[in-house]
Amino acid sequence: MILLINSHVKAAGKDHILSVEQAAELEDVDCIIVLGCQVRDVGSLSHMLRDRLICGMEVYKAGAAPKLLMSGDHGRVDYNEVGAMKRYATQNGVPSEDVFMDHAGFSTYESVYRAKEVFEAEKVIIVTQKYHLYRALYIAKQFGVDAYGVSADLNTYVGQTMRDFREVLARC
């Protein structure tokens, strides 16, 4: 049953995963959602988050959408994914006014829900690693969001086998 559900979620999203160039050809996209990921104690980015931001900024600079929505965990004073994300984007040429921050994107579900219900996004491009994109796109479809994804797999990541296993279970 788990494998059947996993296959269904992957099949539902595979045709919506695009290259940066394909994403730039979409019309009327409200924003590019960059999903949060771990930041270290001093606020430095994990490799996965840095790659998500690099890809998100590339999609933005290609003209795919007018705004970036950084969605991540800022549930504690001493932990701020979205602050680190915005800082990285603005230090790399994205105007501050083009970066929105969702401080309550504690999960993929919450990030997509809040993009629609709080930020009123109807058509989005989601940027995260490919293993994660399938579920993000599936959730967006369930909320009625017209969503496309761009994979941020710029590197090989330590612990990916465990993340892949966890993701299969998360899709159920």
Segments and roles (model prediction):
Residues 1-4:
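Hydrophobic membrane-insertion alpha-helices, especially the h-region
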Residues 6-165:
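A structural signal for short, hydrophobic/glycine-enriched beta-strand patches
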Residues 172:
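Carbohydrate-recognition loop of C-type lectin domains
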